[in-house]
Amino acid sequence: MQEVYLCLDVGGTEIKAAPLDKRGNFLAPVRHFPAMAGADRQTLLENFGWIFSSICPENAVPIEIDLAFPGPFDYKNGICLLQGLDKYDALYGCNLRRAFSEISGLLEQKIQFINDAAAFALGEMAFGQATQAGRALFVAVGTGCGSAFGVNGFLAEEGTPGVPPNGYFYNAPFRDSCVDDYISRRGLEKLSGEMLGVPLDGRALAERIAAGDERAKACFRCFGEQLCDALQPQIEAFCPDTLCM
C-alpha cells in the first residue's frame, strides 16, 4: 500500500486538506471542509477525524498527519491555546497531538503542527513570491490576522530585532482595541455593518463591488486603509523588503 502524508491547512472558516506523497506531490486535489470552529470539543474532534478519513486515498496508509494551525498554540507539544478569537474556543487546553493520535491510530510523534502563517511564509520563501527576499513580512487575513517574519529564506529567530514574540502582532494595540478586532473577518463585518447597514464578509463585499456598488467599494478602501495603519508599526520596526499577503 502507498504511504501518504495527510496535510491540513486549518482556518477558522474552512479547512483545506489533501494527501501528499514522500516527495511532496499532491495525490488528490485539495478539498475544502467546513471548520465548524464554533462547535463543542467532541464535534470538532469528530470533524477532524472525518477529514482524515475522507482525504486518505483507497489502498493507501497514512504515515503522518501534518497540520498548519492558527495560534496561539503550543506547537512543540500539540496543545491548542486559542481562546476568545472567534474560533476553536472549545479546544483550549486540548492536547490535539494525543487526540489525533487516538483518532488516527498513528503514534503521537507522527502528528505534527506548525503555525499557519509560518507555513505560508515557508512556502512563499521556497516556491513563491519571496524566494529572493532578504527580509519578508507575511500577513494572512481571515478569521483573524496571522503573521510571520522571514530572513534570508528562514523564519526569523525569536529575538530578531523588529519581530514581535512568536511573530504575532494580532494582539498588538490598535485604535481602541487590538489588530485582530479590526483586521479580520469580524473586523470587516463590523465595518461593513457601520458603513452599509449590513455586516458582509470579503466575498459578499467583493460581489457588491463587482456589481458596481460604490458604497461597497468605499468600505473595502476603508478596510485597506485600516490594514495599512495596522501594518505600519511592523514595517517600521522590521524594515522588510518584501510583503506577502
Predicted region positions:
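Short beta-strand segments
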Residues: D9, D66-P70, I114, F138-G144, ...
